Amino acid sequence: MPMLRIITCICLCFLGGSIAQAQRLLPKQKGISLSWVAPAEAFTSSFSDDFGVQLGYSINAKRGNYKHFSLEYQRRLYPYKSLNIPVERDIGAGGYSFALISDSSKTVALNLGAEALLGYEVVNHSKSLLPDGALLKNENNFLYGAQVGLQIETYLSDHFLVLCSGKVAALWGSSFELLRPCATIGLRYMF
């Protein structure tokens, strides 16, 4: 009798999993994501201290498209003689992602996204004088711009997704480079 209960429970788990699989990408379904962000320059050296973290919120629309909003913190180190000058960016983003292709079960999807960006950049912890007496001409600035990117999403279960993307941001207002490519990897929980 206990063996029958165990087998019944296992069968119900598999049955529930296959039924729930059809409930992916429902309109108005929401998701929270946490991603690690690496600038393209981080891949050119064997080890890099450049990084970023992104917290996102998404709301599904029709046909696998969705609106998304995010807050992102980035830190890059620019070498100067024997020093590294930190540049930190706090960026808010809002945009829309269009489903390009996916398999029939919606387990794997490729999306194209576009976002508007607004943020603030802090150079060397707001200190313009370096230890060797040099003066930084770069200043703290407000940033604004746009970002486009391709993202691959893969469902691990009915509620968890793995996200991998490549993006290029154009940020005006900064005294550093205008175009900033990056790669992200993260997890999203759908509810």
Where do the model's predicted regions map?
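Outer-envelope beta-barrel architecture signal
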Residues: 24-32, 63-69, 106-112, 140-142, ...
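Acidic, glycine-rich flexible loop segments
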Residues: 136, 143-154
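Outer-membrane beta-barrel "beta-signal"
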Residues: 179-191
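Extracytoplasmic loops and strand-loop junctions of Gram-negative outer membrane beta-barrel proteins
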Residues: 35-40, 79, 131-136, 167-170
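Gram-negative (and chloroplast) outer-membrane scaffold detector with strong preference
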Residues: 56-131, 160, 189
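Short glycine/proline- and aromatic-enriched beta-strand/turn motifs that initiate or cap beta-hairpins
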Residues: 21-76, 188
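Cleavable N-terminal export/targeting peptides
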Residues: 1-29
